[in-house]
């Protein structure tokens, strides 16, 4: 049996360095892909796509059917421990949320914003509203289960927009999902469910009008 030599040590050290380099390279590629996807989704969600050709190219890069059925879910977190005052702490919480959504919902496309995570999910328009509502609650429970390992004081909340046909209409669902998340506490107070974790815009009823007008005077009248 040959003895362990200095050359063996050098070979092992070189192998470790090579592995570290490969892991670093893969991480850098993944981060670039996330950034690239984030920029594309930002343009689609904010209605900045200016042509059919651009839409087709974006759909191809995202590996999405431009004519498919989708809905937008906007995730946020609420710290039930101490108030979030430090911006770095808030960003850390959003990073934890992003990781939780990616782990539990590997099939959705994710756009990261400053204070929220936006998920684009394929949707079946033939399912009933009750079925969709149940699915959304299950999604929140899954993400919340993942978040408890990060910080037990962080509560996941989500607003859900309508199902739209075609990527070009995603801004409609995105606006609804954002409005639903913004009004989740108010809606919970009205419904008597203070512990609301998910709100579908379609469940707002007449309160949809509050989100669909930019006229301050009309809002005062309501």
Which residue ranges define each predicted feature?
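Regulatory loop-to-helix N-cap segments in sensory/regulatory domains
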Residues: 2-9
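Cytosolic nucleotide-utilizing catalytic cores of signal-transduction proteins
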Residues: 9-10, 15-222
């Amino acid at each position: 049996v040959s003895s362990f030599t200095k050359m063996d040590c050098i070979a092992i050290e070189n192998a470790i360095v090579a592995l570290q380099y490969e892991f670093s390279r893969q991480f850098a590629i993944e981060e670039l892909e996330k950034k690239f996807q984030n920029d594309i989704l930002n343009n689609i969600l904010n209605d900045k796509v200016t042509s059919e050709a651009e839409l087709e190219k974006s759909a191809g890069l995202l590996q999405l059917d431009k004519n498919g059925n989708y809905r937008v879910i906007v995730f946020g977190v609420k710290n039930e421990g101490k108030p979030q005052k430090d911006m770095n702490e808030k960003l850390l919480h959003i990073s934890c949320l992003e990781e939780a959504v990616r782990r539990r919902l590997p099939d959705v496309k994710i756009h990261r914003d400053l204070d929220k995570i936006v998920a684009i999910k394929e949707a079946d328009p033939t399912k009933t509203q009750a079925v969709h509502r149940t699915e959304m609650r299950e999604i929140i429970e899954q993400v919340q289960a993942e978040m408890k390992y990060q910080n037990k004081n962080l509560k996941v909340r989500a607003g859900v927009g309508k199902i739209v046909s075609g990527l070009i209409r995603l801004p409609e669902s995105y606006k609804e999902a954002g409005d639903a998340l913004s009004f989740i506490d108010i809606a919970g107070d009205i419904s008597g469910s203070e512990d609301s974790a998910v709100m579908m815009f379609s469940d707002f009823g007449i309160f949809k009008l509050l989100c669909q007008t930019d006229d301050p005077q009309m809002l005062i009248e309501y």
